[in-house]
Every structure is written in structure tokens, then in C-alpha cells.
Amino acid sequence: MSDSPIELMRSTLAGFQIAPDVKTISNIQDIRAQIQSFREKELEGSQTKFKVLSRKLEISTQAMESLKQTAESSQHAEEILSREKEKFRIAKLLNITENEIMSLESQLQKMKEQLLQLEERENTSEDICQSEENANMLKLNFYHSLGFDLETAENTGNKRVIIHTENDLQTVQISNKYSPYFYSNYFWDLLDDSKDKK
């Protein structure tokens, strides 16, 4: 056996088995890393929850403050709402009234136009009646000059024609059985006969 220190150290080191220890140390380091990661995640989760709870607390505080203000001004808000409803109702009534006024104005304008048309027709009818009366007067004067006189019975309304000739006087009753054309020819024939007798 050599007494050299170097050889002694080598033989001593050769007797140690460090591979299992190295593996154990590596496993310990992995576990520590996992624990550290888990703690960091837990911390992040706790911080997130804390932020969420803080935000909820802030919102709840604001809501409570808003509720207090609303409770204090609820009566005023109801009055404003009631006034707004009344304004809306009045505006609606005004709109309906304006539409009715426009409709009535349109109807009035149409009635004025119809009245004007009726007046024009009445004036035209009066002119026509006047013209017819004038024409009838001319016809009666003409027939009278020929010896024809038209008479109407007051009690019955029947009409008759009295024909005056130099030698005779004839009366012809006018009936609806015969046409005006028939009577016209008949009267002219009488005139011709009276002329022939002359």
C-alpha cells in the first residue's frame, strides 16, 4: 500500500458514491422552484381578488352614495317627471288642435269654392231663365200678331189656344197626347186655310 497522499485522496474519493446525492439535490431544487412558482401564482391570484374586491367596494360605495342622493331628490324627480308628462300631454293636444284647425280651414276653403261655383251657376241659370222668358215673350207676341192667344185655366191649369180669324174664332185645347210638332203643323194649316178662304 502506497503512503502517497495523492494516492490516498484518490482512493478515498473513489470510495464515495455522489451521483445519488447530486440527483437528490437536483430534485430538491426542482421542488423549490415548483413551490416558488405556486406561491407566486397564489400571490398573483390573491392580488387579483383583492383588486376585484376593492373595485366592488368602490362601486358599492358609489351606489350607496347615489342611492342617498336619489332618496334625497326623489320627490323633486317625481315633480319633474310629472311636469314633463304634462308638457307632453299639452303638446299632443296642441298638435291635434292644429291638425283639426288645418282640416277645418281646408273644408272652409272647399265650401267657399263650392259656394262660388253655385253662385256662378245661379247667375248663369238666371241669365238662361231671363233669356228663355224673353224668347217666350217674343214667341207670344209673334203668335199674337198671327191671331193666336194662349190661355191657361185658373182652376184646372189646362191650356188652350184661341185662334182669331177674320171670319171665325176657334178654340183648340192643348193636350199632352200630341206633340208640339203636331200642334205647330195644325196651327199653320189653319192659317193657310184662313188665307185660302180670303
Swiss-Prot record:
GO BP terms in the entry: attachment of spindle microtubules to kinetochore; cell division; chromosome segregation; meiotic centromere clustering; mitotic sister chromatid segregation; sister chromatid biorientation; spindle attachment to meiosis I kinetochore
Protein family (similarity comment): Belongs to the SPC24 family.
Organism: Schizosaccharomyces pombe (strain 972 / ATCC 24843)
Gene3D superfamilies on file: 3.30.160.430
Keyword Nucleus: yes
Complexes and interactors: Component of the NDC80 complex, which consists of ndc80, nuf2, spc24 and spc25. Can self-associate. Component of the NMS super complex which consists of mis12, mis13, mis14, ndc80, nnf1, nuf2, sos7, spc7, spc24 and spc25.
Coiled coil segments of this chain: 51-130
Localization in the cell: Nucleus; Chromosome, Centromere, Kinetochore; Cytoplasm, Cytoskeleton, Microtubule organizing center, Spindle pole body
GO CC aspect terms: chromosome, centromeric region; condensed chromosome, centromeric region; cytosol; kinetochore; Ndc80 complex; nucleus; spindle pole body
Biological role: Acts as a component of the NMS (Ndc80-MIND-Spc7) super complex which has a role in kinetochore function during late meiotic prophase and throughout the mitotic cell cycle. Acts as a component of the essential kinetochore-associated NDC80 complex, which is required for chromosome segregation and spindle checkpoint activity.
Cross-referenced CDD domains: RWD_Spc24 (cd11565)
Keyword terms of this UniProt record: Cell cycle, Cell division, Centromere, Chromosome, Coiled coil, Cytoplasm, Cytoskeleton, Kinetochore, Meiosis, Mitosis, Nucleus
Protein name per Swiss-Prot or TrEMBL: Kinetochore protein spc24
InterPro entries from the UniProt entry: Ndc80_Spc24, Spc24_Fungi_globular_sf
Main location: nucleus
Gene designation per UniProt: spc24
